[in-house]
From Swiss-Prot:
Domain I is involved in oligomerization and binding regulators, domain II is flexibile and of varying length in different bacteria, domain III forms the AAA+ region, while domain IV binds dsDNA. Residues 405-524 are annotated as: Domain IV, binds dsDNA. ATP binds at G232, G234, K235, T236. Belongs to the DnaA family. This is Chromosomal replication initiator protein DnaA. GO terms for molecular function: ATP binding; ATP hydrolysis activity; DNA replication origin binding; lipid binding. One of its GO terms (cellular component) is cytoplasm. It comes from Burkholderia multivorans (strain ATCC 17616 / 249). Residues 72-187 are annotated as: Domain II. Residues 1-72 are annotated as: Domain I, interacts with DnaA modulators. It comes from the Bacteria. GO terms for biological process: DNA replication initiation; regulation of DNA replication. The gene is dnaA. NCBIfam families: DnaA. Plays an essential role in the initiation and regulation of chromosomal replication. ATP-DnaA binds to the origin of replication (oriC) to initiate formation of the DNA replication initiation complex once per cell cycle. Binds the DnaA box (a 9 base pair repeat at the origin) and separates the double-stranded (ds)DNA. Forms a right-handed helical filament on oriC DNA; dsDNA binds to the exterior of the filament while single-stranded (ss)DNA is stabiized in the filament's interior.
Length: 524
């Protein structure tokens, strides 16, 4: 029995992602084998994992058992009686290797202050009486007299030193002390959002890797870096993390985070006040520009023109530009073609909705940050029912915590169902397999009936596999249930389709884009 389980575990570890294996297979243990009845009993640490493994992996484990013993084996799943004595199984997504980063705003500010002090001792400060250049004076005037134009002033000695490169030189570092706080005020960065507290999974691992590469080599690796994806998937978190990491590494860097709507507003005000020269000087002098939700530039020709000039100047000076949007660059309507071509000249990366294991990790980490020990059962229950984005998960967790506190009850699955009653009702009627089949059939111009047929031409089989993949990702149906809805196919056929499309999605940009469009369409 134990020999079989070692063999089975080794095969499943090769077939599954590390996250899936650690979450679902590693916590299991064989507890009994009845040779006369040909039954194998496998224990799971909790009810949720028992149900999930039974629906998703029982067929594969039974196949491996049959091959091992050369006989049909009935696989039974039971609750581990020692489950309460065990520590919770790992559900968090392992973070990609990286040097330790500061955690939380206080630690980040403290680390930057320490870097500032070190830089000040190593680099002579600029004289206090250096006169302010016209550029800095204009920015200072706009910042103080016209506060609603969002151009933070730069320290006088930075402006006097001229445009810096990424390597700090004489006069580049601002004064120590409270300057770390003022740098956050000027950059508009949120010190809470760091790489250290960004939960990584399959859905965002490429985006995180690209972000780290850009933070380590700004203006060199990928310029621009364009991140796109739906609301609440972590785009803003990642670009703030890049800015925060750069401030830690190069405290004198000129960094600016701005939402596209604020940029549009500033262009309008600069136009009204005839302050475009000052506006240009400020943005063209940055080392890192982070612009969020650029789809808000749609139809705003003057804003697009000014941003084009800023983009060209920054890239020419080897400054880094990072952009986010809710959709693929070429899908943004009302944006000038020359801007689209600039967006495509760097690296474009999609951030997808988090997979189940990643959603669990997000919930448990967020609960931990709130000082709450959230049980794995509850985290899995919430993650299984709420699939769209991180903000939705965090909002659900806040409701659960508030409901628990108000009623003076411990957090359990029953309490969670009560707290999220309205939200779960909405979720349960959102996406059906039938809707997925119709949407995919329309997208690829085939008949819905082809989803159930036995036809195997590539122009039919491929969309059918895509529909199976989306059914697995976007609904709570088990593999056998999905197979039944696709013309009574075996669950192994569905599993093959899901794995095939998931693997190709990570390698094929066009397929990834098509899936992103389909997912956005289905989610409305």
């Amino acid at each position: 029995m134990n020999d079989f389980w070692q063999h089975c575990s080794a095969l499943l570890e090769r077939e599954l992602t590390p996250q899936q294996y650690v979450t679902w297979i590693k916590p299991l243990a064989p507890v009994a084998f009845d040779a006369s009845a040909n039954t194998l009993s496998i224990a799971a640490p909790n009810r949720f994992k028992l149900d999930w493994v039974k629906s998703q992996f029982s067929g594969r484990i039974a196949d491996l058992a049959r091959d091992f013993w050369n006989a049909p084996i009935e696989v039974q799943f039971v609750l581990d009686p020692k489950a309460g004595m065990r520590s919770p199984a790992a559900g968090a997504a392992p973070a990609a290797p990286r040097a330790p980063l500061a955690s939380g705003p206080a630690a980040t500010v403290a680390a930057i202050a320490a870097n500032l002090t070190a830089n000040q001792s190593a680099t002579p400060a600029a004289p206090a009486d250096v006169p302010m250049t016209p550029s800095a004076a204009a920015a200072h005037h706009l910042n103080n007299d016209d506060a609603d134009i969002d151009l933070p002033s730069l320290p006088a000695h930075e402006a006097a030193a001229g445009r810096r490169t990424w390597r700090p030189g004489p006069g580049a570092a601002p004064a120590a002390g409270g300057e770390a706080d003022s740098m956050y005020e000027r950059s508009k960065l949120n010190p809470v959002l760091t790489f250290d507290n960004f939960v990584t999974g399959k859905a965002n691992q490429l985006a995180r890797a690209a972000a780290i590469q850009v933070a380590d080599n700004p203006g060199i690796s990928y310029n621009p870096l364009f991140l796109y994806g739906g609301v609440g998937l972590g785009k803003t978190h990642l670009i703030h993390a890049i800015g925060n990491q750069l401030l830690l590494d190069k405290p004198g860097a000129r960094i600016r985070y701005i939402h596209a709507e604020q940029y549009v507003s500033d262009v309008v005000k600069a136009y009204q006040r005839k302050a475009f020269d000052d506006f240009k000087r400020y943005y063209h002098s940055l080392d890192l520009l982070l612009i969020d939700d650029i789809q808000f530039f749609s139809g705003k020709s003057r804003t697009q023109e000014e941003f084009f000039y800023a983009f060209e100047a920054l890239v020419a000076n080897k400054a880094q530009v990072i952009i986010t949007s809710d959709t693929y660059p070429k899908e943004i309507s009302g944006i000038d073609d020359r801007l689209i071509s600039r967006f495509d000249s760097g690296l474009t990366v999609a951030i997808e909705p988090p997979e189940l294991e990643m959603r669990v990790a997000i919930l448990m980490r967020k609960a931990q940050s709130e000082g709450v020990n959230l049980s794995e059962d509850v985290a899995f229950f919430v993650a299984k029912h709420l699939r769209s984005n991180v903000r939705e998960l965090e909002g659900a967790l806040r409701k659960i915590l508030a409901y628990s506190k108000f009623h003076g009850r411990e957090i359990s699955i029953e309490l969670t169902k009560e707290a999220l009653k309205d939200l779960l009702t909405v979720q349960n009627r959102q996406i059906s397999v039938e809707n997925i089949q119709k949407t995919v059939a329309d997208f690829y111009n085939i008949k819905v009936a082809d989803m159930y047929s036995k036809k195997r031409p590539a122009n039919i089989a491929r969309p059918r596999q895509i529909a199976m993949y989306l059914a697995k990702e976007l609904t709570q149906k088990s593999l056998p249930e999905i197979g039944e809805l696709f013309g009574g196919r075996d669950h192994t056929t569905v599993l093959h389709a899901v794995r095939k499309i998931a693997d190709e999605r990570s390698k094929d940009a066009q397929l990834n884009h098509e899936l992103h469009v389909l997912e956005q369409t289905l989610k409305g």
